[in-house]
């Protein structure tokens, strides 16, 4: 007996009756490389993208290292006029967006632009241009500012510029929830498709805030690593000798599609996004809730939203910032959610190799989660050398681990107690 096409077509809605959503393309501009594939290869190989800071003068600051994008030239993808009118965080977002659209094989001219949308996360906007603008006002006066100064620095301009370049005329938003923003960029885009407001969403996060403003602000908070002697060893999440995060920049972009739309155009489906959870600590401006209650809620809600149980998760891409407080609190939160299964699930931190790119971090980590499922390999947490009794789980230390990975949880926890988590799964039709 033959099966009709209608009978063989995959289920198009999830257990709550919402449209299923899949990932069909990724793009990344990162300290480990300017493409998603180079980024992923560096992660699997356990390379570090952290080195001496070159984007600003570090003379007066205790931290002199960063995760900077190597040899980034915006004119590889943008014309000269566009490049001049964009801040760096917008340039890398547009570059990543163009790559993601190409990876997805989307012919935008054949799509209804009102059904194409975008949500990007960003934390700092155009910090370097704000700093330079302040110098101009101080030395030459405010009337010597560029007429593009104000539109260049606004956090929503990356979203706006990607929309303009790609012709996205549907739902648009910018998420500014600090270190959780990139993950919320993906999660909020997921919800737009689930409620029927779009067929395709460009999603993720971008950040390029390396500047004296950022360096000084984080330094006086004592949030940054000062292990300048060997930059590649400075970011060491969950390690007993961790001393703060390493500032970084980068963008990670995912193309999310309604499953039905992806099938109709014969898209190559990389994986499925099945769960999203968001919570607030309501606790402190910069410190996480000591017991990880807010982080645990976001994880539990994301897993529940995916119709899973915690012990079904194969791998956790941790927030893992390399700060003394975050890593121990995140470990406690994982134990609250997973119970005894916490000691069996594999966990690793992308930030061990690229540093912390704030609003761009969750976008790059989401790309890493997609590639984890596609390639069946979990990248390591590098620089894990000295066990911390408060961080006693399996952090995939120092070497990648190859095994089938079907269900992944990604964590992002931002300043102000903003928590966001995503679940990615193997697409099985």
Predicted regions and their residues:
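Condensing-enzyme catalytic core mediating Claisen C-C bond formation in acyl metabolism
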Residues: 20-24, 51, 229-306, 315, ...
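Active-site-adjacent elements of ketosynthase-type condensing enzymes
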Residues: 2, 58, 62-68, 125-129, ...
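Flexible, low-complexity linker/loop segments at domain and module junctions
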Residues: 2-23, 110-113, 306-312, 343, ...
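Conserved beta-ketoacyl condensing-enzyme motif
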Residues: 23, 38-39, 44-177, 206-217, ...
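A glycine- and small-aliphatic-rich helix-loop capping segment at beta-alpha/alpha-beta transitions
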Residues: 37-44, 127-142, 192-195, 215-228, ...
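Active-site-proximal alpha-helical scaffold in enzymes
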Residues: 93-107, 155-158, 163-207, 245-267, ...
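ACP-dependent fatty acid/polyketide chain-elongation machinery
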Residues: 2-82, 104, 260-270, 367-382, ...
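Glycine-/small-residue-rich "gating" segment that lines the acyl/pantetheine channel
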Residues: 139-146, 184-187, 191, 200, ...
């Amino acid at each position: 007996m033959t099966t009709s096409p209608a009978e063989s077509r995959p289920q198009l809605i999830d257990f709550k009756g919402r449209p299923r959503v899949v990932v069909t393309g990724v793009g990344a501009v990162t300290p480990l490389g300017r493409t998603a594939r180079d980024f992923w290869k560096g992660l699997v190989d356990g390379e570090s993208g952290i080195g001496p800071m070159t984007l600003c003068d570090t003379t007066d600051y205790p931290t002199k290292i960063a995760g900077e994008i190597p040899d980034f030239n915006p004119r590889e993808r943008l014309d000269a006029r566009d490049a001049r009118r964009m801040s760096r965080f917008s340039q890398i977002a547009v570059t990543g967006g163009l790559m993601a659209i190409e990876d997805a094989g989307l012919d935008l001219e054949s799509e209804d632009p009102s059904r194409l949308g975008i949500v990007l996360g960003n934390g700092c906007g155009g910090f370097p241009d704000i700093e330079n603008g302040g110098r101009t006002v101080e030395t030459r006066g405010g009337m010597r500012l560029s007429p593009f100064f104000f539109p260049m620095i606004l956090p929503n301009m990356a979203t706006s510029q990607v929309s303009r370049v790609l012709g996205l005329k549907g739902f648009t938003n910018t998420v500014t929830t600090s270190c959780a923003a990139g993950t919320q960029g993906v999660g909020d885009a997921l919800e737009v498709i689930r409620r029927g407001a779009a067929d395709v969403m460009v999603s993720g996060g971008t950040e390029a805030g390396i500047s004296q403003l950022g360096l000084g602000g984080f330094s006086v908070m004592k949030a940054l690593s000062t292990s300048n002697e060997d930059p590649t060893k400075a970011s060491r999440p969950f390690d007993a000798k961790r001393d703060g995060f390493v500032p970084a920049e980068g963008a990670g972009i995912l193309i999310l599609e309604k499953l039905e739309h992806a099938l109709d155009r014969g898209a190559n489906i990389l994986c499925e996004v099945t769960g999203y959870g968001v919570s607030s600590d309501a606790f402190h401006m910069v410190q996480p809730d000591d017991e990880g209650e807010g982080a645990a809620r976001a994880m539990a809600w994301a897993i529940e939203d995916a119709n899973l149980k915690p012990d079904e998760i194969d791998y956790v891409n941790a927030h893992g910032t390399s700060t003394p407080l975050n890593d121990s609190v995140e470990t406690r939160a994982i134990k609250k959610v997973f119970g005894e299964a916490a000691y069996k699930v594999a966990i690793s931190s992308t930030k061990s190799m690229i540093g912390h790119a704030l609003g761009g971090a969750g976008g790059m980590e989401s790309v890493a989660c997609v590639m984890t499922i596609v390639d069946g390999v979990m990248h390591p947490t590098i620089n894990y050398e000295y066990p911390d009794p408060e961080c006693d789980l399996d952090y995939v230390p120092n070497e990648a681990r190859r095994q089938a990975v079907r269900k992944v949880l990604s964590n992002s926890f931002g300043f102000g107690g903003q928590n966001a988590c995503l679940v990615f799964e193997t697409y099985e039709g």
